[in-house]
C-alpha cells in the first residue's frame, strides 16, 4: 500500500499494523506511533515535526525492524525502547532525536547478538543515544 502527499495531525497510529506500507512526501504533525508495527515500512521525504515545535512524533516501543526513512525530517522524535534492528536512516534530520534504550540488536543466544543499522548522511546533533547497543 502506498500513501502520497497526505497530512496527518494529532493522529494516533499506536498499536496499528503499518508493516510494508510506503509513505511518500507525507506530513505527520504530533502523531503517535507508540507500539506500532512499522516493520519494513518506508518513509520517503516525509516530515515528522512542524517548524517551531519542541517535540516530534513518538515511536516509543515501536517495531521498526528493517524500516526505511529517506530524506525525512525527524528532529526531536522519540525512538526510546524501539526495536530498530536493520533500520535505514538516510539523509535525515535527526537533531535532538531520543534513541535511549533503542534496540539495534538481534539476539541469537544468551551471549551472542548481531547489530544492524544503516545511518548515512544524517544530522545527529544533540541526539540521545543513552544505553544504545549499536
Annotate the PLM regions:
Residues 1-134:
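Tandem repeat scaffolds
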Amino acid at each position: 500500500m502506498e500513501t502520497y502527499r497526505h497530512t496527518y495531525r494529532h493522529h494516533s497510529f499506536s498499536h496499528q499494523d503499518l508493516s510494508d506500507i510506503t509513505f511518500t512526501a507525507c506530513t505527520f504533525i504530533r502523531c503517535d506511533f507508540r507500539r506500532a508495527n512499522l516493520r519494513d515500512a518506508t518513509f520517503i521525504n516525509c516530515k515528522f515535526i512542524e517548524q517551531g515545535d519542541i517535540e516530534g512524533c513518538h515511536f516509543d516501543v515501536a517495531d521498526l525492524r528493517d524500516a526505511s526513512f529517506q530524506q525525512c525530517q525527524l528532529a526531536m522524535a522519540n525512538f526510546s525502547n524501539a526495536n530498530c534492528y536493520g533500520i535505514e536512516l538516510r539523509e535525515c534530520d535527526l537533531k535532538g532525536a531520543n534513541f535511549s534504550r533503542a534496540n539495534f540488536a538481534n539476539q541469537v543466544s544468551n551471549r551472542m547478538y548481531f547489530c544492524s543499522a544503516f545511518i548515512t548522511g544524517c544530522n545527529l546533533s544533540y541526539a540521545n543515544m543513552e544505553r544504545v547497543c549499536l
